[in-house]
Design a protein with these regions (language model features):
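Conserved N-terminal glycine/acidic-rich loop preference
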Residues: 90-130, 152-176
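Active-site catalytic pocket residues across diverse enzymes, especially alpha/beta-hydrolases
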Residues: 83, 107, 139
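Acidic, Mg2+-coordinating phosphoryl-transfer loop and its flanking beta/alpha structural elements
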Residues: 139-142, 146
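Histidine-anchored nucleotide/phosphate-binding helix
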Residues: 29-36, 129-139
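Active-site acidic carboxylates
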Residues: 1-91, 112, 145, 154, ...
Length: 176
């Protein structure tokens, strides 16, 4: 079974408090990827709460973002219809809320080992790499691919470095 994981394509990461020109530039690529994908599509959603500034992440990245229920927390409008088109027993509406860099319930969500995963989204050097490595840990023999043309890092340099780390862990990187 093929699974496309769209990582954190939320307003705050695209054109909000942590948005970048690179993140804005990948939106059309991600939309085309989603439209043409044959398989199941899941979205991760970075989720913080009003106490964000008191968390470890808030102390190290003192920019409030993706606060639950805010506009910045929302999946971008270009992808929202694709994100909210399913319901299953584990994931509500195809969106997996995560409260740290990586989603930690992969094994509960995908109980079998017969999956191929493809990831894209933001930020390559934080949440994309964290989720790719978590998938590698839970599914050591799975084909895991990251589409570089559908990812953006905090900076272009960090994007490139994260791609190299993923390659080192037998994650296929395409469209560099």
């Amino acid at each position: 079974m093929k699974v496309l994981v769209i990582v954190d394509m939320q307003k705050d990461f695209i054109d909000g408090s942590l948005g970048t020109p690179e993140a804005q530039a990948i939106v059309p690529n991600v939309v085309e990827k989603v439209k043409g994908f044959e398989g199941d599509i899941y979205f991760t959603r970075d989720t913080h709460f009003d106490d964000y500034m008191n968390t470890l992440e808030g102390k190290n990245l003192p920019v409030p973002h993706c606060i639950n229920g805010t506009e910045g927390w929302s999946i971008i409008k270009e992808l929202n219809d694709y994100a909210c088109n399913r319901t299953d027993e584990v994931v509500s509406k195809g969106i997996m809320d995560k409260f740290t860099f990586g989603y930690k319930d992969w094994r509960q969500t995908f109980r079998l080992d017969e999956f191929e995963f493809e990831l894209c989204g933001v930020c390559t050097d934080i949440c994309v790499v964290s989720n790719a490595l978590a998938l590698r840990m839970f599914y050591p023999d799975a084909l895991i691919t990251v589409d570089a043309s559908c990812c953006a890092g905090v900076t272009p340099e960090k994007h490139a470095a994260a791609l190299e780390v993923m390659k080192s862990c037998q994650i296929d990187v395409i469209n560099e």
